């Protein structure tokens, strides 16, 4: 039998059995593409090619793959030769029909560990691509253990294998499967409220939503992150399918008996909450696994707002057979199962550190930690797995009970910037990679040298639900403080809720910043807090905490949400205010960063300053101000606001203004 005959026979068998398979093609780039083209020519199908520079249609970049979720393809090629976008790879696997091949193009097998991966630029905070040895070794181990996955290496013998026959698969007929039928019955009888259907990919949740719409007595509006992702839902809903984009729906005032939200976890929480409040009955569907944000985390974070929530889960695959080899290898490679989250750890707690090398030496340990973090955090994705395995500057602590993970803490090194770079960040001229809190302390704070201090930021912390409220989280933070004795502080950035803040307060953190707009992902304002460890860290924490107290009333008015600290009634312009105001007027500091000191400046100035007063005192939008002042756009408006701030400062004290300009990065030559 020729190679083509063997390939076609194996593909026919896969179609009859309702399964999909992964073929890894590893070698030089040209050789990999030649093999992929030959297989593509031998098998009819869609053959979606996912690559930064795919040579054939239909094609898609990894970044654009999100727009195709909810669609189906027969066969696909994923080119990871330059870099492995794990989330896009997982998402692509979920779009493939039964009987499909997924071809994964990879560099020469022996170079995987040492070869720089361009995808690392998205998650490593490095200026250049870095090798990713832990992920490469993990992928090799996973592939070597799976006889259902094929590996074709350049200059190595390869033949198409034969596999024992499986039970013949009966594809879905379009009628509800038993699991779906039971949920449909419950939904039809549901009183007003919110229902969720969560499932791994391929379980028919979009089909279920469409079947429900086609059979319901009332009316329904469908919304989703992208209309292109609702093809399956639309096919089952038929002529009763009525789609509106989330923002258009919110603006329209449209009404219906039901709102159906497909892939709800991918819609920003504040927007979703507003939509949900408008309809008597809501059906939310979302994926339980991590490449779109975890469905389990979606339930934890968003659905906790609805105590009478009706929860449904689909477990049996509909679009392919159980034990599909492609689904199994993707789940194993990207750790989509959550065994550590599902099993309760009992016994005394012991806390210890582990390092990235553990992925190669004792992989069960970091795997269990990742499973716990993934189950507890709604935004954990394969990108976090890549970062956990190979990004520099990561630190990990685990709390175990009888060899089971009960809690975990993940910290990231930050700060240590040069004085020159820190000052440039403060002035708004530079934004180097990474250093989330350290940069924010400089860019949004009062100290130009804040980013020179060295800290460790809490990236993730989780305690198993069965062991919460025992102080395990506080023990992890206390242990982290001891391990970071050479640092100036620990830091954390989080979506503010009173409950979360109480936890960080109990750990010893001091609130130093509140954002001025809600996070799209959580619907909360961003809060930043420091736990000082050195004298310099204490001075910085005290200084920024005091600044926040001075600005508290203004931020409360701006945000419409109280800040949890005692406000200071100090309206006089102090040295920090003057320095920051000059940074706004003559450098690139953002307007909303300088809310407090600009408000105080307006109180002291008798000048009209219409662009500043209109934005800060009247809260007019940029568009309104541009129309009112006959300005061409936001850039011109900001330039005018900077010029008006400069005018007010010079009028108050020209000499002081000039002295501060003279010592500013760039000499204050970048006046707006």
Predicted segments, located by residue:
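Terminal substrate-recognition subdomain of acyl/acetyltransferases
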Residues: 248-250, 258, 270-271, 277-378, ...
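Conserved lysine of the Walker
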Residues: 32-33, 205
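N-terminal pre-P-loop "Q-motif" helix
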Residues: 2-10, 171-191
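Conserved beta-hairpin
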Residues: 393-412, 419
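Conserved RecA-like ASCE P-loop NTPase motor core of nucleic-acid helicases/translocases
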Residues: 20-28, 39-41, 45-52, 196-198, ...
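Conserved acetyl-CoA-binding loop-helix of GNAT-fold acetyltransferases
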Residues: 207-211, 460-483
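Conserved coupling/interface region of RecA-like P-loop/ASCE motor cores
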Residues: 125-175, 304-342
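N-terminal accessory nucleic-acid engagement/regulatory domains that precede
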Residues: 65-162
